[in-house]
């Protein structure tokens, strides 16, 4: 698949086949996602694969902050990838001071780049994804026993797509681009 084709064809997949993605495919996707750019090559993204049905159901029922649509999507998903990021590195100098006025905001920026790279690599391999950003971070952190220096960036549903969603309408270049 060519890069532009992947960018233009990748969709959030919300209808899944109930089969797990093989671990070797997941490992290939993570290996590709490791090439996502990051602040000073800090590579702060980490990946936690959750396949245990009880854990996924608990995440869906208790950790999507009463957003029923996400609860339903997560409950139906055969596996989820929790993308976390190591804190205190991206946007920081070695002495702990900030390198930029954006301060710790670069952590989520780098996590977002990693999430997009992960999703494009998954799509290349026929794996559907849907990114969820609305969740109870503290509960997920406790449930998955994440290290103290990691925060949850997003939760990504992983699946074999049951159908290929139609492309939503996109804004025109004229709406998006300004020349000065």
Segments the model singles out, each with a brief description of its role:
Residues 33, 81, 87, 96-143:
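Small-aliphatic-rich amphipathic alpha-helix that forms the alpha element of a beta-alpha
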Residues 2-3, 19:
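N-terminal accessory segments that position/regulate proteins before the catalytic core
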């Amino acid at each position: 698949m060519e890069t532009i084709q992947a960018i233009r064809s990748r969709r959030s997949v919300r209808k899944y086949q109930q089969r797990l993605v093989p671990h070797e495919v997941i490992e290939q996707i993570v290996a590709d996602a490791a090439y996502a750019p990051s602040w000073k090559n800090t590579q702060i993204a980490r990946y936690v694969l959750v396949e245990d049905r009880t854990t996924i159901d608990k995440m869906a029922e208790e950790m999507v902050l009463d957003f029923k649509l996400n609860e339903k999507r997560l409950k139906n998903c055969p596996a989820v990838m929790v993308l976390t990021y190591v804190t205190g590195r991206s946007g920081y100098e070695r002495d702990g001071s900030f390198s930029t006025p954006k301060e710790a905001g670069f952590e989520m920026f780098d996590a977002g780049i990693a999430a997009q790279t992960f999703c494009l690599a998954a799509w290349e391999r026929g794996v559907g994804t849907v990114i969820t950003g609305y969740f109870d971070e503290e509960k997920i952190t406790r449930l998955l026993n994440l290290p103290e220096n990691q925060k949850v960036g997003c939760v990504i549903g992983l699946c074999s797509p049951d159908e290929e969603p139609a492309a939503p309408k996109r804004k025109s270049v004229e709406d998006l681009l300004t020349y000065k």
